[in-house]
């Protein structure tokens, strides 16, 4: 159970990081 929760937290963290990086690149392209 703990490993599953840790895996889910890591997945959400990776998804958030990817989304933030994508938005950052879009802002750089717009500028």
Curated annotation (Swiss-Prot):
GO terms for molecular function: electron transporter, transferring electrons within cytochrome b6/f complex of photosystem II activity. The keyword Secreted does not apply. Its main location: plastid. The chain crosses the membrane at residues 4-24. It is found in: Plastid, Chloroplast thylakoid membrane. Belongs to the PetL family. This is Cytochrome b6-f complex subunit 6.
